[in-house]
Amino acid sequence: MARLKLIIAYAGTRYAGWQIQCLPAGRPHAVQQPTVQQAVEDAAKAILGSAVRVHGAGRTDSGVHAEGQVAHLDIPDAKAAVDWRRALNAKLPEDISVLQAAVVPDGFHARFDAVKKRYTYRIWLTRAFVLPQRRPFVHMTGPLDIAAMDAAAAFMTGTHDFASFQNAGTELATTVRTVYSITRTPGLAPDDFPRSHDTTPRAPLELAWHFEADGFLKQMVRNMMGLLLWTGTGRCAPEDVPAIIAARDRRLSAPTAPACGLTMERVFYPDECCPPES
C-alpha cells in the first residue's frame, strides 16, 4: 500500500463539517448530512472500486471553509501512478477541490503529525453588495474599535488553558494550547472595485484576523473571534480577557462567531515528516 497526501480546498456552506456524522441512535428516520470527508471518500471509492478511509488534519465545523485542509489515505501500490488530483476532482462536487496530491512516507499522518495550523476569519465592513461566493466573510455594519481588538488579541497569545473557548462535545486530556500569533490584515480594499474619479482614501472594506497555534479546541477560533468582536463593540474591555481565560468557564466568554467567516488556511508539518508546502 502507498500513502497519499491531499491538500483540499472547499466551500463549507452546504456541508455539516469535515467529519462524517454518526446517525443518532433511536432515530430511524434521521437523514445523513453531507460532509466533506464523505465526499472525498466517495470520490476515492469510485476510482478504487472499494471503500477507503480518508483522515483529515482538522475537523472543520459545519459551514467552515478551507483553502489548505490536509488529508491522507492509503491506496494500492498499483494505483500510485494515477494522477490523483485530476482523478478525484473529476468525481468531486464543484465546491470541493483537490489542490495537490502526492505519495508520502508510510508513517505520515495528516492529523497527528501536524505541528501548527492557521485559520483566518474575515469580516465585511460595508453595506455595499458583494457576491457571497466572492469571499467567505461575516457582514458587519457597525463601528469596531480595532485598537481594542488588537489589545485583546495580544492577551490571547501564548500558552494558556483555553477551556473558556471550547464548546461542549469533545473529551480531551488537556485544554492547554499555544497560540503563536493573532494578526490582522486588510482583505478586499475599496480599490478592488470600480469607482468614479474620486481618489479620496477610503477605509478597507474587509478585515481578516489570522490565528496560528499548535492546535485548536472545538470551535476555539470562532469563540476567540467572538470575544474579539465583543471587545470591538464595547461589550468588554481588553483587560477583561486574562480573567476570562483564567476562569476556564465557557459561560463567561462571548457567543461563538458565525461559521461562515472562518477558513482553514494551512496545516504545517515538520520538515523531517513531509516536505514544506511551497
Swiss-Prot record:
Keywords carried by this UniProt record: Isomerase, tRNA processing
The enzyme's E.C. designation: 5.4.99.12
Binding site for substrate: 119
SUPFAM superfamilies: Pseudouridine synthase
InterPro entries in UniProt: PsdUridine_synth_cat_dom_sf (IPR020103), PsdUridine_synth_TruA (IPR001406), PsdUridine_synth_TruA_a/b_dom (IPR020097), PsdUridine_synth_TruA_C (IPR020095), TruA/RsuA/RluB/E/F_N (IPR020094)
Alphabetized GO MF terms: RNA binding; tRNA pseudouridine(38-40) synthase activity
KW tRNA processing (keyword) present: yes
Record flagged with keyword Phosphoprotein: no
GO BP annotation list: tRNA pseudouridine synthesis
Reactions this protein catalyses: uridine(38/39/40) in tRNA = pseudouridine(38/39/40) in tRNA
Active site: 61 (nucleophile)
UniProt xrefs under Pfam families: PseudoU_synth_1 (PF01416)
PANTHER family: PSEUDOURIDYLATE SYNTHASE, TRNA PSEUDOURIDINE SYNTHASE-LIKE 1
Described purpose of this protein according to its UniProt entry: Formation of pseudouridine at positions 38, 39 and 40 in the anticodon stem and loop of transfer RNAs.
Family membership: Belongs to the tRNA pseudouridine synthase TruA family.
Assembly and oligomerization: Homodimer.
Name under which the protein is recorded: tRNA pseudouridine synthase A
Organism for this UniProt entry: Oleidesulfovibrio alaskensis (strain ATCC BAA-1058 / DSM 17464 / G20)
Lineage of source species: Bacteria, Pseudomonadati, Thermodesulfobacteriota, Desulfovibrionia, Desulfovibrionales
